[in-house]
């Protein structure tokens, strides 16, 4: 559904649609060498509490720790497909620092040649919806 939405948005905005596909990030079946990868990682979803208040009681610390580990593995796996000079956009819908800034800081510390170009976190009133986090990484 998200990929379809991206295609529809690109068409509506009269933008060239980039190559889009859905794959397991653990073993992405990439053809060619992508210059930019958008990584919308599985997360705790705590930025959606306004719409899903039950998450407050459904998410356990163990589940969140498992998601942080999964995010780490996905970042490491996908990074290897990026060419020198390529970009990786890392996106979550959580406000949990361990899944956001903490994840990116740890990635930068263990990954030579990775740099942070920009990061942002939406505020509750910025879009009138979910809290989102994003980081743009560049490979040297």
Segment roles from a protein language model:
Residues 1-140:
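S-adenosylmethionine
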């Amino acid at each position: 559904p998200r990929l379809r939405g991206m295609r529809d948005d690109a068409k509506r905005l009269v933008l060239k649609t980039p190559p889009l596909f859905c794959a397991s990030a653990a073993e992405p079946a990439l053809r060619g060498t992508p210059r930019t990868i958008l990584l919308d990682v599985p997360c705790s979803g705590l930025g959606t509490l306004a719409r899903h208040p039950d998450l407050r009681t459904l998410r356990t610390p163990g589940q969140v720790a498992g998601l942080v580990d999964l995010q780490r593995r996905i970042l490491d796996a996908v990074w290897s497909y990026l060419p020198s000079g390529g970009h990786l956009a890392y996106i979550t819908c959580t406000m949990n620092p361990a899944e956001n800034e903490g994840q990116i800081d740890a990635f930068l510390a263990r990954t030579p040649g990775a740099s942070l170009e920009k990061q942002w976190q939406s505020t509750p009133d910025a879009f009138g919806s979910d809290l989102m986090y994003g980081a743009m990484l560049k490979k040297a």
